[in-house]
């Protein structure tokens, strides 16, 4: 499954500080020469890849970024302070284009990979630089140069091998948070997740598996209800589906069938995709009144899929479930685009 997130922003490097006109005025140097210092260089703008970021969502609310200006020069040949560079963090996998020309400026694929995107302006020259035999007391200096301004288009492409599906509040965001370093928004109301959350889960071998928490589906999603087609499309290219079911529900079988019917109605082979079921939230279940093992057996008979009894909160049962997922993935051919992201 490939996610393409886009954002358009403007970045501006800092203007260089102005050079100044100044002359030496020491007590015993009555005819002191020029001593105006140069302006400081403006700050530059850099992009840095951060493995803890998952989307370009922040750029939808903040479209303009500007580095600090350099300060003006000082007397006694003092150069002004340089402007602070601006570091903009983006997720690994972000591609940066010039929005006006379409030129590819950079592709940040590795953690901490850095790209200079806009150069700060040079500081202006102070009048000390214009001293000559003809002009012993120059009374002019140069202003600092402007920093580069660029209109940019950012694109983020990520591929997920495992799609976590289920009704709203089944615990998908909590699970992906427990399994990986992702920290999705988590709250106890439907549709908390409005965009897919991505997390990389490491195998004991060190290889990473990309999991996607697909926003909650509801009855009628295949016809556009709720968050509808947008999120069913997100799971078309997943290789394995992890179907999370709330064990505290008053009708676990109904909940399972709701998602199953939506996958079948949508088509695209989703219902035939390799699937694992997980009864979640067992930490909140009264084991004296709810027979989890019987529910798991019933779900297994309905789905012909392995069923695990887990708690995303306490991490109970997660390891056997992961081993099953990795076993299925190991038996399948790895797409080239997924391999490239490992």
From Swiss-Prot:
Cofactor: Mg(2+)
Gene Ontology cellular-component terms listed: cytoplasm
Pfam families assigned to the protein according to its UniProt record, in alphabetical order: GTP1_OBG (PF01018), MMR_HSR1 (PF01926)
Binding site for Mg(2+): 173, 193
Entries under Gene3D superfamilies matching the protein: GTP1/OBG domain, P-loop containing nucleotide triphosphate hydrolases
Principal place of residence: cytoplasm
Residues annotated for GTP binding in this entry: 166-173, 191-195, 213-216, 280-283, 311-313
Domain OBG-type G intervals: 160-330
Disulfide bridge map: none
EC number: 3.6.5.-
NCBIfam families hit by this protein: Obg_CgtA, PRK12297.1, PRK12299.1, small_GTP
HAMAP family according to UniProt: GTPase_Obg (MF_01454)
Family: Belongs to the TRAFAC class OBG-HflX-like GTPase superfamily. OBG GTPase family.
Listed name of the protein: GTPase Obg
Organism this protein belongs to: Nostoc punctiforme (strain ATCC 29133 / PCC 73102)
Gene: obg
